[in-house]
Structures are given as structure tokens and as C-alpha cells.
């Protein structure tokens, strides 16, 4: 089961908006749908945010309120440097990501602050099980090492 928590914007700390999917394919459909929506970064009018974090009932958004991750993880990539910028940036980015991470199943989508010259994106990975809160710091450290620390350190989901 893949599950997520939805936040209206960057300031929203309410954790009651959740969704669950019984297959990765259905979860992917949501990701692709969200990626086609027009986004805005930051503030009360920003795009909705999703997180694999599931929270203790009645608690607000904070690390200490997380009880598990819903069988997926992602890396927010805000400072990726393309090896070759002479051609089409999107084509080059796809090529480089495939060369580095093609052995893994993942979904990649751009974030609201992405530009053609400075792509910012999320890599979303299915997991074989949920990650309990007690294991999250070790899991995050291992995942970041595995993926060459390309993820934004401030965003641990």
C-alpha cells in the first residue's frame, strides 16, 4: 500500500489529508496528474505538497509526529548540474538520470521552481514496504548515499 499526506501549501501543518493506493501504477497516475498541474512556489498560494510521511492522528506536521513513510520515498533535487549543457536541457537531463539511476524504477517530475536553465525536480521511488519512524534517519542517510547525495538535505522525504 502506497500512502501520502497532502498539504495545501508550504505553511499548512494539518496532517489529516491523506490518500492510499493499492498499487504503484495507481500512485504513478496521481504523480503524473500532479505534474501536469500549473504550480507556484512558496506562500499561501503555492502548489499543494505531498509527502510519504504519515503522522500520528491529531498531530501537526513535524518530524516528531511522523510514524512511518507510506512505502515510497523521494529526492528533491534543486542543484543538479548537467554534465553537458550544449543541447536540449530536458533531453540531456533524461539521459544523465537514466545513466545514473536507470537500474531503479522511479518517476521524475519537475517542481514549481524549475526553469529550463536550472531544472529542479523530484525523483520518486517505490519501496517494498513502509518505513517505520525509528528507521527513518538510517534509511534517509543510506538513500542519500546510494544516490550520490543529489537530494536537497533540507527536504527529507
Give names to the regions the model predicted.
Residues 1-121, 125-138, 142:
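Signature for HUH/AEP ssDNA processing cores
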